[in-house]
């Protein structure tokens, strides 16, 4: 197996500093890993992965740590790993831009996002502060060009978005609110339009006075395609149209500053989202959210 040493400290403390750890090894072999910030070259990567003997090989970027099956890296990434891990770093940083973390990262935390592949038939998932992929799912997005031209960046960006959706992860919205982040990644990549249902479905929803979501917590009943469109419409208006280019960063800061937010009933959290969004926009957005069903009572 692989040995990982976690070093946690208060980065604001005067004595917080990098330390060196020596671990005497009585057996086994050093498999090595690729560090973008230290090695940077394809030649070094090729040498390291060819000499590695373990089932997994680690690629360390500036923001992302990929712990993938070595056989898949040899198959799909024999000589373009620098561009590949750089793209994953972009996925993370672009989502950080929406979250407005400049005041707390890296001053308060500097950990990487971890992504691992596993030996099972699973697809893609997120949990416990990391993202994961079934070994066969890697085939969908490991060739670098697929991240650009075949919309395959959506899957990894969607899972990374799960790590960042906490303030808007309302019951009935778990698989949709994170797509604010994956739609932003699509926009930044610049090859595809956004995902989500057309606004004609919103008109039908409004006509039938349907609520925005339900509180059953069942992803199968979640209106994911329409939900993600609402978050993106706000981005299009405030960011793309230049009305208020810091709308989402300031909104997420305000949500984070409410330390009691996740202890509130989900309905109250949604109403606070309406209030905070209006505060940040300096506009009364009640009509907008009413159109999307926020004000429609839920009896589920």
Q: Model-derived features: where do they sit?
A:
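A generic structural signal for solvent-exposed, polar alpha-helical segments
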Residues: 40, 131, 295-298
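Extended acidic/polar, glycine-enriched regions
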Residues: 1-53, 58
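Catalytic cores of extracellular degradative/oxidative enzymes
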Residues: 45-240, 245-251
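Generic hydrophobic, helix-prone segments enriched in Leu/Val/Ile
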Residues: 21-23, 88, 231, 274
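Pan-zinc metallopeptidase signature
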Residues: 236-300
């Amino acid at each position: 197996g692989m040995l990982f040493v976690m070093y946690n400290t208060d980065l604001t403390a005067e004595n917080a500093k990098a330390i060196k750890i020596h671990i005497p090894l009585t057996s086994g072999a050093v498999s090595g890993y690729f560090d973008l910030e230290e090695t940077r070259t394809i030649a070094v990567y090729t040498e390291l992965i060819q000499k590695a003997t373990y089932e997994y090989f680690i690629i360390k970027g500036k923001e992302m740590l990929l712990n993938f099956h070595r056989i898949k890296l040899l198959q799909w990434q024999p000589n373009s790993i620098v561009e590949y891990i750089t793209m994953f770093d972009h996925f993370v940083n672009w989502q950080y831009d929406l979250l407005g973390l400049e005041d707390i990262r890296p001053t308060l935390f500097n950990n990487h996002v971890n992504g691992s592949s596993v030996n099972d038939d699973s697809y893609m998932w997120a949990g416990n502060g990391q993202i994961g992929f079934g070994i066969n799912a890697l085939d969908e997005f490991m060739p670098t060009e697929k991240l650009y031209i075949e919309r395959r960046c959506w899957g990894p960006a969607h899972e990374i978005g799960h790590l960042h959706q906490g303030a808007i992860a309302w019951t009935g919205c778990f698989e949709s609110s994170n797509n604010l982040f994956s739609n932003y990644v699509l926009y930044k990549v610049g090859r595809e339009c956004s995902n989500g249902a057309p606004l004609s479905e919103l008109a039908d929803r409004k006509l039938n006075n349907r609520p925005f979501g339900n509180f059953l917590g069942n992803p199968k009943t979640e209106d994911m395609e329409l939900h993600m469109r609402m978050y993106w419409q706000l981005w299009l208006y405030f960011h793309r149209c230049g009305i208020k280019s810091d709308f989402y960063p300031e909104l997420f800061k305000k949500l984070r500053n409410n330390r009691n937010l996740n202890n509130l009933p989900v309905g109250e959290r949604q109403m606070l989202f309406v209030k905070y969004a209006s505060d940040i926009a300096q506009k009364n957005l009640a009509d907008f959210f009413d159109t999307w069903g926020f004000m429609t009572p839920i009896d589920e």
